[in-house]
Amino acid sequence: MVQAGNAIGGSISHDGSLVVVQNYEPGGIKAFDANTLELVADVPATTEDGTRSKVVGLADLSGKRFIYSLFEAGEIRITDFSDPAKPVTQRFAGGKQPYDALVTPDGRYYIAGLFGEDGLALIDLWNLDKGSRKILSGYGRGEQPLPVFKMPHLRGWSVAGGRAYLPAIGRHEVLVVDTDTWEEVDRIKVKSQPVFAMARPDGREIWVNFAFPDNGWVQVIDTVTGKVTDTLQPGRGILHMEFLSKGHEVWLSARDDNKVVIFDTATKKQIGGFDSASPSGIFFTTRAARTGF
């Protein structure tokens, strides 16, 4: 039985009662009973002119609320499913073509990456009456970006030690942003175009993978010095990484080798692995206890 259709991503409410998915076509979100998978609400992403927009960047918030972005419409919306029969939606300006988004680990901010313009859209979830605001608005101005082989995933951004580490679109850089001011404080040169910049759970390191043709490489950044300390070749087609909850191991999907490889984060050596047919995302159950997924 097909319920969600061409869902491009999903999230679960805090109480575990609802599964909500986002759709490209037709644009919108759908809520399902987590036990029966019965459709309980269908919320179209309808724009002012009556067309429907692709939905991206879906994340759970406190209660039965979900936040998401509308690509064509340039909006951010929050839908409250406290009464699934009568969902209530708030709308905010989102900038031009938001393509992905994340909620910061403390649950306070929702940040959407913008494909159609420089900068990012930020909403303070503790102060919704202030609406959205633009951050890093000058990023990329006056520079010639490289061709984009793969869009970075914002869920692969990291927040560690009061700094956010963001993959730069079309550049061989990781941006460092102060999370108090949301201003850029540094740029770290890396081997190629970053896709994921993921923090070890203790925040001491950022592990970075890259777009094709350099997707067999991984680099490690020291968050104290802001320098690349290790350059690794774990396998062919490294698409995703996930740390164990205490950070002593990282699992990497090597799609083109049909393997998942396991590295010791202290020694940077492979300590295990197993066969898997074209592995992509790796997700551990520890995510179930984190807001924004």
Q: Residue ranges of each PLM-predicted region?
A:
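Predominantly soluble domains enriched in secretory-pathway, periplasmic, or organellar proteins
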Residues: M1-F293
